[in-house]
């Protein structure tokens, strides 16, 4: 039996749509899963999902770089994770696989790449999302100390189809609309199908109480959007945004959010991250699970084709 939680009816419909990328028998495959409406912040709603469960994948999180979302992120990412691990312990779950983020790992000075040996540095990664993902990891390690078998995954920017207005999905919708601006920051990227495959491999293995950086390739944002633009046969961005312009942009976005009450869509951290270059090494996960990542060019082409198909439908 596979049981999965969803928070709202609309999110369940989005999940169902994702199934359409992989099967023509969406209803049949979707009905194989027991869907339970729950919120990680509400223990009573989660308890129904934990009945007779042996293995747990915890992926639920709030991703935001808007400082006004910090308290909500703490509630979902830290306290929600605490609820999940406490129930894992209470219901004697065999193993927990937790999806964290590369945001919870900081650079070490004079080291060319970031890997599992690097730790979180509050002075460097002092923005809300990173702090809350690190806090969530601490809850998972606490559960490990109490006897729960755990694995922590730190994926880079996850690229996948279906959620075109949110997070990395916006890269595809913006590129399709020929958004003209770009920055040259570098970070780690990975396809969602690789993340899913590694979660299953980890759960089915004897490996426990380890963490893994999950990154296919390190790419600049410019390289990513140029690749997407080629698939779409659209114009790639041509206007390079300087650090000065980004600094002005986040201040204007902040002012607009204060005056109108709208979400701050371009925060100070977003501006900084757009110009940062961080290189990640994922040798540990490749070696442990004898795994080869799908090349980013292939991932981008596949996801972009799915975006086009959704537009047609």
Residue ranges: model-predicted function:
Residues 4-29:
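Glycine-rich phosphate-binding loop and adjoining beta1-alpha1-beta2 segment
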Residues 135, 166-167, 183-203, 210:
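Substrate-positioning beta->alpha
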Residues 124-152:
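Active-site Tyr-X1-5-Lys
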Residues 144-189:
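NAD(P)-dependent short-chain dehydrogenase/reductase
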Residues 23-79:
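NAD(P)H-binding glycine-rich loop region in Rossmannoid oxidoreductase-like domains
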Residues 79-128:
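Conserved Rossmann-fold NAD(P)-dependent oxidoreductase catalytic core, especially the SDR/UDP-sugar
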Residues 198-266, 282, 287, 294-313:
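Mid/C-terminal beta-alpha module of Rossmann-like enzyme folds, strongest
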């Amino acid at each position: 039996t596979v049981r999965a939680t969803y928070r709202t009816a609309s999110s369940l419909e989005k999940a169902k749509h994702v199934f359409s990328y992989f099967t023509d028998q969406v209803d049949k495959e979707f009905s194989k899963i027991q869907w339970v409406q729950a919120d990680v912040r509400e223990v009573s709603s989660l308890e129904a999902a934990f009945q007779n469960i042996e293995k747990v994948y915890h992926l639920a999180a709030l991703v935001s770089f808007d400082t006004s979302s910090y308290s909500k992120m703490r509630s979902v990412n830290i306290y929600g994770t605490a609820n999940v691990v406490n129930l894992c312990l209470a219901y004697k779950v065999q193993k927990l696989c937790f999806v964290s983020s590369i945001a919870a790992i900081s650079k070490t000075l004079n080291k060319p790449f970031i890997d599992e040996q690097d730790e979180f540095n509050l002075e460097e990664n002092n923005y809300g999302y990173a702090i809350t993902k690190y806090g969530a990891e601490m809850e998972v390690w606490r559960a490990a100390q109490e006897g729960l078998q755990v694995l922590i995954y730190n994926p880079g920017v996850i690229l996948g189809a279906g959620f075109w207005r949110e997070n990395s999905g916006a890269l595809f919708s913006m590129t399709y609309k020929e958004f003209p601006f770009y920055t040259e920051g570098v970070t780690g990227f990975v396809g969602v199908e690789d993340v899913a495959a590694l979660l299953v491999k980890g759960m089915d293995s004897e490996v426990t109480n380890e963490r893994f950086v999950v990154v296919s390739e390190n790419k600049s944002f410019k390289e990513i959007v140029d690749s997407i633009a080629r698939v779409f046969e659209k114009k790639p961005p041509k206007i390079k945004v300087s650090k000065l312009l980004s600094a002005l942009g986040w201040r204007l976005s902040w002012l607009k959010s204060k005056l109108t009450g709208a979400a701050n869509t371009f925060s100070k951290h977003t501006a900084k991250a757009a110009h940062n270059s961080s290189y990640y090494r994922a040798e540990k996960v490749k070696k442990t699970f004898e795994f080869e990542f799908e090349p980013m060019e292939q991932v981008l082409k596949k996801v972009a084709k799915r975006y086009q198909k959704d537009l047609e439908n």
